[in-house]
Regions:
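Charged, often Cys/His-bearing segments associated with DNA-binding zinc-finger transcription factors
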Residues: 1-34, 41, 413-448
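Short, conserved catalytic/metal-binding motifs centered on acidic residues
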Residues: 25, 64, 78-79, 104-108, ...
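Basic, short loop/linker segments at the boundary and entry of helix-turn-helix/winged-helix-like folds
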Residues: 26-66, 70
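Acidic, metal-coordinating catalytic cores used for nucleic-acid/nucleotide bond scission
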Residues: 51-56, 86, 325-334
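Flexible, glycine/threonine-enriched loop-and-boundary segments that flank and lead into catalytic domains
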Residues: 256-272
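Electropositive, glycine- and tryptophan-enriched low-complexity nucleic-acid-binding patches
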Residues: 270-316
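Helix-centered, glycine/charged polyanion-binding patches within enzymatic domains
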Residues: 324-393
Length: 448
């Protein structure tokens, strides 16, 4: 149910947040630039009008999502810091200071699930609109990177131990009979599995791994016998069987029990041979530096990500503005999609090209490398490095929120730098005026 609008009439005894805050602060400016009414109109139809408990204001929830990725903090931290920060409260639509927390951290989870990927895409679209004409660049760079999932490094031993723990929990929850719990056996096996890289312990550890897999299979079969075929745990049992039956050379393996959609991606990095998560595509304007596209995939070939990424960019911009898209050598394939030309580095053997055209392309290829540190900023500053959201939907939500936070941060830095530039100019003018006054006084003093 939608909440009623609060009475914003100011008490005569207290100042409102608008009067207390610095109106040149970037957060204050951003709060007045964002079109909050657009979010109200888009998300209000997702609520019941006359039934249920009144929900939290839509502006509050959208503002908390933006602040979370803008400041790189968790759901719990953003809710806690909101009650301590006047600018956060003004950004989320409050008119007077509120000393209490605005909501429970779990309500952000429900709100993300309510608005879905289309709602998060609206936030990204608004971040592009706030950047104004900077997003109207006809040339952009495209690149893919890996968004790692919040899972441990997968090994067969870890997966089998997880299966054993899950089977025990299900049996305990449903009061099912268990022939043997294997508590002491597993404790001994875990000791044998330690220091497996030592030559003396290698064969002992492998034997312990095989025994652990056997125990996991026994518990799964016993669970299957005791449960009916149409039980709610049937999907879990099928997942356990897939993990136990998969071989080293199989494709589409499962690397996590609680995140079965995780992909193993190798980008050729020396320091990190394999990464476990999903591939994301980023489109970044070359001249102005605005992210105009951020889309999640599984693990396709880079060239196959261009068309869906361009479709999303057209949705976000509302028009086809990209004439040239610059990629690396991994984007071999189509050279033209609709009105957009795809350019990748290659030897300049075409005699039809003039020297001017060759130099122009070389400059664009050099500019394309600027997207690499952008990927780094998205990971370290805006929570793209490790994705804590659940499932494939969580993968797509996280990358779009990170891109939106990057765009908002870009404008905040721009406003901050313009404020300091104006401040420096005023200081210089003041110093010039002081010297001019001193010079006039000296001239007047020594004049005859």
């Amino acid at each position: 149910m939608l909440s009623k609008k609060k009475d914003t009439q100011q008490s005569c005894m207290f100042l409102g947040l608008e009067d207390m805050l610095n109106q040149k602060h970037p957060m204050y400016i951003l709060a007045n630039k964002v079109d909050w009414q657009m979010f109200e109109d888009s998300f209000s139809r997702l609520y019941c009008l006359d039934n249920g408990r009144p929900a939290k204001p839509i502006r509050l929830m959208v503002g908390l999502l933006i602040l979370k990725h803008l400041r790189n903090i968790s759901d719990e931290s953003v809710v806690e810091q909101w009650s301590e920060n006047n600018y956060y409260q003004y950004f989320c639509g409050e008119h007077v200071f509120q000393p209490c927390e605005p909501c429970q951290a779990s309500e952000l989870v429900h709100f993300r699930n309510r608005i879905g990927e289309s709602g998060i895409e609206l936030i990204l679209k608004e971040s592009i609109r706030v950047n104004g004409n900077d997003s109207d660049d006809s040339t952009a760079s495209i690149d893919t990177t890996v968004q790692e999932k919040n899972i441990t490094f997968p090994t067969d031993s870890k997966l089998h131990r997880k299966i054993i723990d899950k089977c025990r929990n299900i049996a305990e929850k449903e009061n099912l009979p268990v022939r043997q719990s294997y508590t002491r056996t597993l404790k001994k096996l875990s000791l044998d599995q330690r220091f497996r890289n030592h030559p003396r312990n290698k064969w002992k550890a492998r034997k312990a791994d095989r025994k652990e897999k056997t125990i996991a299979g026994r518990l799964v079969r016993e669970l299957e016998r005791n449960l009916s075929p149409d039980s709610r745990y049937q999907s879990d049992i099928d997942l356990f069987k897939r993990i136990l039956n998969q071989k080293k050379s199989d494709k589409n393996k499962i690397y996590s029990v609680h995140e079965p959609d995780v992909q193993c991606i190798s980008k050729g990095k020396e320091h990190k041979k394999y990464e476990f998560g999903n591939k994301v595509s980023i489109i970044y304007t070359q001249t102005t530096g605005v992210i105009i596209g951020a889309l999640g995939f599984r693990n396709p070939y880079d060239g196959h990500t261009i068309e869906p990424a361009l479709e999303q960019t057209e949705r976000l911009l509302g028009k086809r503005t990209l004439k040239t898209l610059i990629g690396d050598r991994g984007y071999k394939g189509k050279r033209q999609i609709n009105d957009t030309t795809i350019e990748i580095p290659k030897p300049f053997n075409n005699r039809k090209q003039s020297q001017y055209q060759k130099n122009k392309l070389k400059k664009q290829f050099r500019k394309r490398a600027a997207i690499e540190p952008i990927n780094g900023h998205l990971k370290t500053d805006h929570r793209l490095n490790r994705n804590f959201y659940k499932g494939i939907t969580g993968d797509n939500i996280n990358v779009m929120l990170a891109a939106a936070a990057f765009n908002f941060k870009r404008m905040m830095n721009k406003w901050k730098s313009s404020f300091w530039l104006e401040f420096k100019i005023q200081i210089v003018d003041l110093i010039k005026a002081m010297f001019y006054q001193i010079n006039n006084n000296i001239t007047r003093k020594w004049a005859f």
